[in-house]
Regions:
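N-terminal low-complexity, Ser/Thr- and acidic-residue-enriched intrinsically disordered segments
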Residues: 1-57
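A general "terminal functional-core" signal
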Residues: 1-6, 11-14, 65-363
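Charged, often glycine-rich, active-site loop that binds/positions anionic groups
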Residues: 48-72
Length: 363
């Protein structure tokens, strides 16, 4: 079965020429993907707007109506760092719909896995607040869709954007239906995502922040993946893996100060695909988040698509990061390991009894 992708040119109706997050960003990416023939052999999934009630699963109804009302009134911004246009509600709805369409196609067995190549991004959007170019939280809406419309009990979200997915964390902080793992630079925008923010009430032990030091590179990510993501996934036994796929952790992207490479992105997605293959029938959906340097965005997305389809890693046109990490990631990982017993496992006996094997080496 083939992999799928979602793209719709209507995203360009909502844009701002001076903003890093604009239509030009995604249009430039799609031109690069076509030049590289990266979408050949993939199934293009058509998208139509989902009901507003599905969006309100992640956002309170008052917030959704506020977005629509402010856009109709001609407001230029909904937050200090998130612009509005008259088309913003419809385009943000389409972005959320694309994540749902990709998830639906995977859950219904139409494609093996899928990538939603749409904008605006979503992982900073909280239940009642826009932030960081994000209006609706696409990956959270897709998770609620899987839980409510398909009856899933356990969804795992892995956020690989350079910035902490504070909106996703806030929406699921008290829930044990969704395991949230975020790789991000810390301290950095939006200022949240410390190691010790681990969930509350029923969600205690279901929120993991892999807070990475400046210039953390491929090796740092590999270590964190092995020490945290693998045992968590094995313990949690997800029925679906959703990925907030941000590409601004690349060393060439100045939206952050991290050191991931194109090869590093390939390894991350290949590792997640292997987890999905072993734990949840291959159910894996990537949802585009950040990535503002067109060269590194293109290289990262091509690498991710190759990993999704099971092809070998492409040549990395930009190479590895020239900068060493300023600090090791290990001490924080030790803390996160201590949280794992708080998460209930559907498997008996406990965790670490049958380690998952994935093609992701630490050296």
């Amino acid at each position: 079965m083939a992999s799928g992708y979602v793209y719709d040119p209507r995203h360009a109706l909502h844009t701002h020429a001076q903003a890093p997050e604009s239509a030009a960003r995604l249009e430039g990416l799609m031109t690069y993907l076509q030049d590289q023939r990266a979408l050949e052999g993939l199934v293009k999934l058509p998208v139509e707007p989902i009901p507003w009630s599905w969006i309100a699963a992640a956002h309170c109804g008052h917030y959704v109506e506020t977005v629509r009302r402010l856009a109709e009134a001609g407001r230029a911004r909904i937050s200090v760092d998130t612009y509005l246009t008259p088309a913003a509600p419809a385009v943000a709805r389409l972005g959320a719909s694309s994540a749902v369409v990709a998830t639906q196609a995977v859950l219904e067995g139409k494609v093996t896995n899928a990538f939603s190549l749409m904008r605006p991004p979503g992982h900073h959007a909280k239940s009642t607040q826009a932030m960081g170019y994000c209006i609706f939280n696409n990956v959270a809406i897709a998770a609620f869709y899987a839980l409510r419309e398909h009856g899933l009990k356990r969804v795992m979200i892995v956020d690989i954007d350079a910035h902490h997915g504070n909106g996703t964390e806030e929406i699921f902080y008290g829930s044990d239906e969704v395991l949230v793992i975020s790789f991000h630079q810390h301290p950095w925008f939006p200022g949240t995502g410390d190691w010790y923010h681990s969930g509350a009430e029923a969600g205690l032990g279901y929120n993991y922040n892999i807070a990475l030091p400046t210039w953390s590179n491929d090796q740092s990510y590999r270590l964190a993946f092995k020490e945290i993501v693998l045992p968590l996934a094995e313990r949690y036994q997800p029925e679906l893996i959703l990925v907030s796929a941000g590409f601004d952790a690349h060393w060439l992207d100045h939206a952050a100060v991290l050191g991931l490479s194109g090869q590093g992105y390939y390894d991350l997605v290949a590792g997640l695909r292997a987890l999905a293959d072993q734990l949840c029938q291959g159910r894996l959906v990537l949802v585009l988040e950040g990535g503002y340097n067109l060269r590194s965005l293109g290289a990262g997305v091509v690498a991710a698509l190759r990993a999704l389809t099971g092809e070998p890693a492409p040549p990395d046109p930009l190479g590895p990061s020239p900068n060493p990490p300023v600090a090791p990631v290990g001490p924080g990982l030790t803390y996160l390991k201590g949280l794992m017993p708080f998460m209930r496992s559907p498997r008996e006996p406990g965790f670490f009894d049958q380690p998952v094997e994935v093609p992701y080496q630490t050296k």
